[in-house]
Amino acid sequence: MAKRHKHYENRGSSGRGRRGGRAGHRGRGGRRRYAERNNSERAAPVWAGSGDLGNPEMVDDYYFGRQADRRLWKKDSMRMGGFRPGDMGASEQPQSHLPARKRPVTFTLARDVYDPSHNLNQLLNKQLDEGAEEEDSNSSSPSASGDDEPEGEYEPNPEPKMYRISELNDDALFFVDEQGKLPTKIPAVEVAQQETPRSVEFNDTLTVGKVQLQLRQDSNGGTFVDAPHAKRIFRDDLYGDVSEEEDEPETPKTEQLDNSKSVRTMQPPSPVPQLLSTNIGRLTLSELASESESDTEKPTAEAGAEPPKGEPGFGFLDEDHLADMSEIQVTNIRLGAAAHSYFVASPRTFGDSVARWVDHDTMVDIALELGLPEGRLHAYLRHVYEQLVPPEEPADDGADDHYGDENYDDSEEDEQDDEYENDGLIALVEHTLANDPYRNRDYNTKSLEYRGHGSRKRLIIDKESMIDETVRTLLEDKAAQRSAKRAAKRHAKEDYIAEEARMSSDLFRKYPYGFHIENIIDELEAFLVSPRAALEFPPLDPHGRRTLKNLACAFALICKQVGQSTHTRVLVQKGGRYEPDYDAVNRIRRQRRVFMRVDVRRPRDDITPREPRAKFHVREGAIVGGDAPTIGQDNVGRRLLEKLGWTHGEGLGVHGNKGISEPLMARVKKNRSGLRYTE
């Protein structure tokens, strides 16, 4: 073996490859090798010097580094310090090779300070400068001197004066709206219009029987019934124009106020909290009850409270007519636990006709402002409550009288009722049993018997029975109707199942008995465009399975058999190609057309019965057609021949060339003896 020279050692790889490339390049059996360097070789440490030439004590540090790091150097030499004087090791390792998540965060001081109000300040200063320029231009007047100024000489524009926001007054910065916001919704005020007098007399009262209706007339002359609102209070003047007696002295207004104030008496505060805190041990139930009753008393009258005994209702006293309460229209009320609220419209009080909710105290103030005496305030609120809240109907206690404490003994009444019900019942039963011969007779209650199945099912009725012909016919008709109804229900159910199976994707349900060749082709075409991956056909005979395989191959499908014996099925799967060969499909379509399933039997109704073939028995030597009748007179051909001159028994043809008059006879030959003479 020849010795290899040294210049071959670095070529290729050091392995067993025979034809390696150059050193450091790829070749057979070798790969590129790079010098592996660690982090210490990539970035050698640089020692920092922090000396200062102005300080004699730190000159050594400037050239040779800090005293603490000087021990790392081999020796103190000017050559080592002269490479980077003053900046020895000041540079740090570059961070470019580090990933972003490991790089240190650096903060940079912004050149300009961000001020959000800077633009606003500039805009305000610009507006102030423009206003100052306008004032200067208005105050300065044009020069009236006739001396023309030399061309080219002009006064320079004055520099704009800068203002600070802190030096401006509030009038320049803020706008005071002294006018206020205009109201968007102006309340409407109803103004009563005086009706113009008419020349025609109008009667505002219509009497229908015992009922009087108030009529009104509009501006157009139309008449209508003045029906009051369902929830509006209309106070009628019960006394009419009743004038007070002149002799009766008038009570001053101050006395009325004193009398009205006497109704509302202020009670001292209850000492119940003090008793509960100090004398809780000596407090009795009676004292607590009395104190609680005193607390529940209200200083003002409520609308739903019961009126004092003997107090007349609102409208029955002269004091009720001192104030015009028709100016208050109350259309609704909200009941509360402590006080009620009212839906009130009062143009005199509110200045408009808009209804609004007011509390109890406001309602009292409105009534008092109109001049209603305070003593009749309770009656007025009670009147409002009764007009708006329907009265509660008292419960009928008559139905619960038998639940009272008294005990009634009704045993005697029950005995009398039993005697009355049983009166004559025994005699009626005895008479019925004596005169009814069919009551105690036993009858055979067995079910009816039928014979036959399906449409030939008939009812069997014994002729020896006592049933007459009418009842027999009725029973037969009922039995036939019952059978027909059952058959109709069965057919409807079968039709429903067949319809559901027709829409199903399962071929076993869709084709319960067999296929036509067109059905198979349609199913394969639908399978190509459907998302299904496989299609299974019901069991067919061997020739049907072979035909199905040929069709599957024509449609570029994969076909295989599944199962055994009569349950052998054909499973069709999709392949990679979906382009059918319709020429092969049309060739198969012209072959066998019907394929029946071998795993099910057809019902008897679908089986068409075969007609029996007629059997003819002939004997040896019989004349063929010897028993056939002669052609009658009504035959068209015979009548045509007779018109041409032919007669019965005459041969056909012209004179001198007529045919035979007797036809040739053919005899039946069944044996194999050959031609021979037979008598």
Curated annotation (Swiss-Prot):
Domain G-patch positions: 633-679
Main location: cytoplasm
Highest taxon in the source lineage: Eukaryota
Entry keyword annotation includes Nucleus: yes
GO molecular function, one term: enzyme activator activity
Pfam families per the UniProt record, alphabetical: G-patch
Keyword Kinase set for record: no
InterPro entries for the chain: G_patch_dom (IPR000467), R3H_G-patch (IPR034082), Splicing_assoc_domain (IPR051189)
Alphabetical UniProt keywords: Cytoplasm, mRNA processing, mRNA splicing, Nucleus
Extent of the signal sequence: none
Entry function: May be involved in splicing.
PANTHER family: G PATCH DOMAIN CONTAINING PROTEIN 2
Entry protein name: Protein SQS1
Gene: SQS1
